[in-house]
């Protein structure tokens, strides 16, 4: 029996499993999924878990079940591409085809104290730790959120909804929030923060983090806790692979989402160097094309000379439970409709992933 080994139970590999099972996987193949957790975490909702507006149960789903699908739970400590072996804990798992989708972790940009003194939301365990902190903060406390990208905006707004009795400061490097999107969208988000008493600090440059202080352009600002959302990078085991990578640490891939030196190895999600933000949507689009490549290969057909471009539709974010913002097909949507859109996307994902 040949072995398709999937590393990481995130959005990309979930889509691959659902596309292949029950009828597309060749009869001489089995799938093994490796993950640290015995469930699929809804990473796009970790901000709500960290703020306490969603429960742990609401941000996870069961993995699919099939007679030719099995699981190995544990941390991947080594990937040997030459020997086609992956080390998980004390076990080694071999493969015929490998898909690396181990996701990302926080990038602290060598800022002193950032890793030691910041709370984060990139991984579920970190979001749980952040939840404990946000739930136990005394009234009147100040939380500094470093980074005003999508994650920073969502955790700051969700925290405002769950803790109306604390002060929130959102540190943004740019002149305006979400500078890559239309000014109308930025102004809407900024206005929401003003109306909901979240202080946005533009032109920020956090140079140091202490237990109860953030240093912004060398100015010491007192905070009771810091939440870091200022960048991500592939997990360390992926960054340590001796293959070509971009400056971001993400792995260079060809149009078939393979590493150029080994057609048996595919990269999906946050670990892949793509001309798009590393999002759940991008990972799922990649996964669909990877399955198409599998089908060509298994049918002994020549791969297309040019793969279609990934059709990333846009971005949707929430501002608490009632408002949101979206940029879809070059159209800006704000307010209640955008929030309904985000809830609908999540509902459809859960429905299709069952």
Q: Where does each model-flagged region fall?
A:
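Glycine-rich active-site loop/strand segments that organize a redox cofactor
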Residues: 36-41, 47, 51, 101-136, ...
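C-terminal, flexible cofactor-proximal segment of oxidoreductases
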Residues: 286-354
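Beta1-alpha1 glycine-rich phosphate/pyrophosphate-binding loop at the start
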Residues: 1-69, 154-180
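Rossmann-like NAD(P)H-binding beta-loop-alpha module
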Residues: 131-168
């Amino acid at each position: 029996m040949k072995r398709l080994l999937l590393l990481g139970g995130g959005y990309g590999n979930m889509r691959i499993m659902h596309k292949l099972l029950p009828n597309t996987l060749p009869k001489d193949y089995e799938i093994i999924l490796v993950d640290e957790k015995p469930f699929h975490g809804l990473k796009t909702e970790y901000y709500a878990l960290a703020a306490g507006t969603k429960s742990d149960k609401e941000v996870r789903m069961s993995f699919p079940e099939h007679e030719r699908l099995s699981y190995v739970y544990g941390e991947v400590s080594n990937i040997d591409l030459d020997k086609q072996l992956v080390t998980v804990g004390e076990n080694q798992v071999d493969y015929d085809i490998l898909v690396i989708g181990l996701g990302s972790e926080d990038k602290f940009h060598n800022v002193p104290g950032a890793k030691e003194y910041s709370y984060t939301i990139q991984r579920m365990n970190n979001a749980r730790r952040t939840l404990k902190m946000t739930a136990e903060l005394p009234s009147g406390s100040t939380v500094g959120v470093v980074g005003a990208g999508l994650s920073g905006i969502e955790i700051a707004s969700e925290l405002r909804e769950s803790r109306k009795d604390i002060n929130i400061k959102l540190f943004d490097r740019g002149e305006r929030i979400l500078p890559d999107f239309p000014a109308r969208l930025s102004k809407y988000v900024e206005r929401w923060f003003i109306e909901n008493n979240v202080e946005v600090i533009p032109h920020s440059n956090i140079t140091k983090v202490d237990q109860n202080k953030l240093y912004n352009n060398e100015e010491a600002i007192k905070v009771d806790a810091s939440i870091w959302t200022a960048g991500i990078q592939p997990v360390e085991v992926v960054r340590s692979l001796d293959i070509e990578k971009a400056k971001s640490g993400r792995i260079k891939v060809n149009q078939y989402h393979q590493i150029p030196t080994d057609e048996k190895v595919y990269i999906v999600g946050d670990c892949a160097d793509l001309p798009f933000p590393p999002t759940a949507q991008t990972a799922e689009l990649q996964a669909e094309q990877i399955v198409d490549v599998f089908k060509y290969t298994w049918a002994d057909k020549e791969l297309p000379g040019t793969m279609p471009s990934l059709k990333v539709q846009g971005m949707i974010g929430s501002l608490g439970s009632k408002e949101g913002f979206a940029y879809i097909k070059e159209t800006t949507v704000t307010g209640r409709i955008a929030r309904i859109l985000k809830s609908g996307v999540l509902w459809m994902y859960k429905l299709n992933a069952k």
